[in-house]
């Protein structure tokens, strides 16, 4: 009788064997449980793009009543940690040393300029351009404080201050503009990419190193059954890691979740199959655990960080690099998680990402199936 292409009896037996190996192997639990939580806490508490307290120097070249009043408004802001001095060289030295990130210069003719009709703002703001993000914060905060001070001054003088432009900002999807709320979904993607790739990158390589692959290939097992028994147990282990990441993100880190849990489960499964397939492909090619781990880290971690849109906007990349991002599964999972966490179920985003993730999973698992041979080389 011919050997069937797929026997679920053999698949079940091999999955039981693989599960027992996982239970007995502490490294699998370290990779699937400890490392995701550790990385998530590092991303959640260690990376913060919000500047809540900026160190700014105030150069007082004039100590008039108006200059001191504006300085008092600056120092009263909860966003400014001010260093006041009348010595320009001292403040410049502190800025060069990184002790302050910006410098507000109140010139010697500050009061006289303020008394003139239609006078322009007689202050100078110098920022540290080596950190553009912080420099933009300094500029924005100082401009905001300057406008508030002008309004208060006009009210005290019985006048009405009307700015030329009245900007009313609304932050959709992230009303408080908290950076962790979009960092954490991206961090979960990076973590699941690395975990999924590493978990399976060691599987086939370990079989070759221990000499058990020869025993497996000497049986009636088919390529499809071999791949299934390697994918199924690690799929459940990966979904456990995903569940832990979600619980920590929502209940400990406080990131809101507005999407469907069923959609999250479905898309997470597709993404995990892509990363597990990538790891299996690496393991099948290298046949060495050390080499497989190194290749998995480089093939999974670096592209998912650099080319997924997590840190750098894909639209701002050169056309050649943008083309490369289409084969990076993390690209589609980052936007999916950010959408589900912050905006909810947006079909125009989710449907496209699902299609690309299906194609990615089929590609990696298909390549692994082609590279898996039923003979010893």
Swiss-Prot record:
Q: Which residues form the ABC transmembrane type-2 domain?
A: 145-375
Q: Record keywords: Membrane included?
A: yes
Gene Ontology cellular-component terms listed: ATP-binding cassette (ABC) transporter complex, substrate-binding subunit-containing; plasma membrane
Induction line: Repressed by the transcriptional regulator CecR.
Q: For side Cytoplasmic, which residue ranges? A: 1-28, 203-234, 283-291, 367-377
Keywords assigned: Cell inner membrane, Cell membrane, Membrane, Transmembrane, Transmembrane helix, Transport
The protein's GO terms of the molecular function aspect are: ABC-type transporter activity; efflux transmembrane transporter activity
Question: Which locations, inside or outside the cell, does it occupy?
Answer: Cell inner membrane
| Biological process per Gene Ontology, one example term | tetracycline transmembrane transport
Q: Which InterPro entries match?
A: ABC-2_transporter_component, ABC2_TM, ABC2_TM_bact-type
Q: Name one Pfam family in it.
A: ABC2_membrane_3
Periplasmic-side stretches of the chain, per the record, are 50-181, 256-261, 313-345
Top-level taxon: Bacteria
Question: Does Heme appear among the keywords?
Answer: no
The membrane-topology field of this record reads: Multi-pass membrane protein
Q: What is the role of this chain?
A: Part of the ABC transporter complex YbhFSR that could be involved in efflux of cefoperazone. Probably involved in the translocation of the substrate across the membrane.
Similarity comment text for this entry = Belongs to the ABC-2 integral membrane protein family.
What does the annotation say about its assembly with partners?
Answer: The complex is probably composed of two ATP-binding proteins (YbhF) and two transmembrane proteins (YbhR and YbhS).
Please state what the protein is called: Probable multidrug ABC transporter permease YbhS
């Amino acid at each position: 009788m011919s050997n069937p292409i797929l026997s679920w009896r053999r698949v079940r037996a091999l999955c039981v064997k693989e599960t027992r190996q996982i239970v007995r192997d502490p490294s699998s639990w370290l990779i699937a449980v400890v490392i995701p939580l550790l990385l998530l806490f590092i991303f959640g508490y260690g990376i913060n793009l919000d500047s809540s307290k900026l160190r700014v120097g105030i150069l007082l070249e004039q100590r008039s009543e108006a200059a001191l009043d504006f300085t008092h408004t600056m120092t009263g802001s909860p966003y400014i940690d001010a260093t006041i001095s009348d010595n320009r060289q001292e403040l410049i030295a502190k800025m060069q040393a990184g002790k302050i990130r910006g410098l507000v210069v109140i010139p010697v003719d500050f009061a006289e300029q303020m008394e003139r009709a239609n006078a322009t703002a007689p202050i100078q703001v110098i920022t540290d351009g080596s950190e553009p993000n912080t420099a933009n914060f300094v500029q924005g905060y100082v401009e905001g404080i300057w406008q508030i001070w002008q309004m208060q001054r006009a009210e005290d003088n019985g006048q009405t201050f009307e700015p030329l432009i009245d900007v009313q900002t609304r932050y959709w999807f992230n009303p408080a503009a908290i950076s962790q709320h979009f960092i954490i979904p991206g961090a979960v993607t990076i973590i699941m990419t690395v975990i999924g790739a590493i978990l399976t990158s060691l599987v086939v390589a370990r079989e070759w190193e221990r000499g058990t692959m020869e025993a497996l290939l000497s049986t009636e097992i088919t390529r499809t059954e071999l791949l299934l028994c390697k994918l199924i147990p690690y799929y459940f282990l990966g979904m456990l890691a995903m569940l832990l990441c979600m619980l920590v993100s929502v209940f400990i880190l406080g990131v809101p979740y507005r999407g469907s849990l069923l959609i999250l489960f479905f898309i997470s499964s597709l993404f995990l199959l892509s990363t597990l397939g990538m790891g299996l492909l690496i393991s099948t090619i290298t046949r060495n655990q050390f080499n497989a781990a190194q290749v998995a880290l480089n093939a999974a971690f670096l592209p998912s960080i650099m080319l997924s849109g997590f840190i750098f906007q894909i639209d701002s990349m050169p056309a050649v690099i943008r083309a490369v991002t289409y084969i990076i599964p993390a690209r589609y999972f980052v936007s999916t998680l950010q959408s589900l966490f912050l905006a909810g179920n947006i079909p125009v985003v989710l449907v496209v990402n699902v299609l690309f993730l299906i194609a990615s999973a089929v590609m990696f698992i298909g390549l692994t199936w082609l590279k898996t041979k039923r003979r010893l080389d």
